[in-house]
């Protein structure tokens, strides 16, 4: 399979005549009735020299849900997050055991199209990282690399993505200005728009608000709650308050192990493991 997606595969079905004020998706079914879109089975991750970072991780993540990974620094939560779209492949000497399935496809099997995987599973990093290009070129950069040349289609992708990232109204009159001139919160929402522009099905977010002020953090959280209607979201956060505000499910990690995974309400109100209780009550810090 080619590592370059044809534009008809990723961007097919675009309606260039549609009203940009799209109807909101129907109300989501109960969490228990949603399909599993990510399944992690007996997953182990090793850095160079066989230094083990994750130990026998098992979990399933539902579609159109927000799952937060919490735990002290170095507990493995970001390592697992980056394993879901194989970003850790970029770490020299790393290796894995076990499996991760995304939409019932084992992503670590030989012959996996990693480029296609990373299109379907987008990534938003801790620090906003807009390219030193215009706002417009930041958003359409990915589609262009996948072969989209039509200005009309690129314009639509740009507007749709910025609208979904709750940024369109703030930047629609300055799309050709440098993205680096935006505020920190706007830059992070631009990076979310850039990820959305690739038409992913899953969004991975690695502490996306850690560098933002409280107002910008609130805007991103409101955006994430809205995006859940269309995407499955997995987020690493150091903020327990953030986890309680936005997530459906929470996973607590400690020293590379998944200690407890349950609905966010149960994790924070009635944890089953004393180590989880120690962490959320502040008796075990970072």
UniProtKB/Swiss-Prot annotation:
Q: Which residues form a coiled coil?
A: none
Q: Which Pfam families match?
A: ABC_tran (PF00005)
What EC number(s) are associated with this protein in UniProt? 7.3.2.1
Q: Which keywords describe this protein according to UniProt?
A: ATP-binding, Cell membrane, Membrane, Nucleotide-binding, Phosphate transport, Translocase, Transport
Topology versus the membrane: Peripheral membrane protein
Here the segments flagged for biased composition (Basic and acidic residues) are 1-12
Catalytic activity line of the entry: phosphate(out) + ATP + H2O = ADP + 2 phosphate(in) + H(+)
Q: Name one GO cellular component term.
A: plasma membrane
Task: Give GO MF terms, alphabetically.
Answer: ATP binding; ATP hydrolysis activity; ATPase-coupled phosphate ion transmembrane transporter activity
Q: Which GO terms describe its biological process?
A: phosphate ion transmembrane transport
Report the subcellular localization: Cell membrane
Q: Where is the ABC transporter domain?
A: 38-280
What are the binding positions for ATP in this chain?
Answer: 71-78
Region feature Disordered, mapped onto this chain:
1-27
Q: Which domain of life is it from?
A: Bacteria
Concerning InterPro entries, the annotation shows: AAA+_ATPase, ABC_transporter-like_ATP-bd, ABC_transporter-like_CS, P-loop_NTPase, PstB-like
Give the record's family classification: Belongs to the ABC transporter superfamily. Phosphate importer (TC 3.A.1.7) family.
Q: What does the UniProt record say this protein does?
A: Part of the ABC transporter complex PstSACB involved in phosphate import. Responsible for energy coupling to the transport system.
Subunit comment: The complex is composed of two ATP-binding proteins (PstB), two transmembrane proteins (PstC and PstA) and a solute-binding protein (PstS).
Cross-referenced NCBIfam families:
3a0107s01c2
Instruction: State the name under which the record lists this protein.
Output: Phosphate import ATP-binding protein PstB
